[in-house]
């Protein structure tokens, strides 16, 4: 939980310093409608603030209290056994494709009219994105988002912070493919 308000968490309330006053707006709507409707989906990033075990305990407490959302899940909870195999197969296909494309991409890594080639600067990112842990992680996340969208079903809307992260596109696509409603 990066940016978690630890004081509120100690009281069983989920409050992110990232979302700030949006929590109050969502709570007001829930009170007006008589029930919580927000489904919180967390993507785990290692952080010094809390261990994974502590994060799970907080998530469980937020679920028990039920004050700030209808559900609280980590993305990885939606990975099924078959998703692991499908993601691994997709990752292997990307590995093979990147190796085939690399011989064509390497000479193309320059601006038009320039002979300065940027391949030496980008080759590590290329390899990590297609053949490394990041590539496999993205394949797993893509499967998990599709599973989440299917499980969540139609929603009023899906909202996420626009930080230009690869997972944002995956969430958007999964929600649209599942017909879950608008994405903001």
Question: For each predicted feature, which ranges?
Answer:
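Catalytic-core helical/loop segments in enzymes performing group transfer/polymerization on anionic/lipid-linked
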Residues: 1-184
């Amino acid at each position: 939980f990066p940016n978690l308000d630890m004081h509120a968490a100690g009281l069983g309330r989920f409050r992110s310093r990232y979302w700030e006053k949006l929590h109050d707006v969502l709570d007001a709507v829930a009170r007006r409608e008589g029930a919580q409707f927000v489904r919180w989906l967390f993507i785990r990033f290692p952080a010094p603030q809390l261990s994974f075990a502590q994060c799970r305990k907080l998530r469980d407490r937020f679920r028990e209290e039920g004050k700030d959302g209808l559900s609280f899940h980590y993305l990885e909870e939606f990975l099924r056994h078959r998703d692991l195999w499908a993601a691994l197969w997709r990752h292997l296909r990307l590995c093979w494709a990147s190796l085939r494309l690399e011989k064509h991409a390497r000479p193309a890594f320059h601006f038009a009219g320039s002979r300065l080639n940027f391949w030496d600067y980008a080759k590590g990112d290329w390899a990590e994105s297609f053949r490394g842990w990041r590539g496999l992680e993205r394949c797993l996340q893509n499967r998990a988002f599709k599973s989440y969208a299917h499980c969540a079903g139609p929603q009023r809307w899906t909202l996420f912070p626009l930080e230009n992260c690869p997972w944002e596109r995956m969430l958007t696509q999964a929600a649209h493919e599942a017909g879950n409603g608008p994405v903001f």
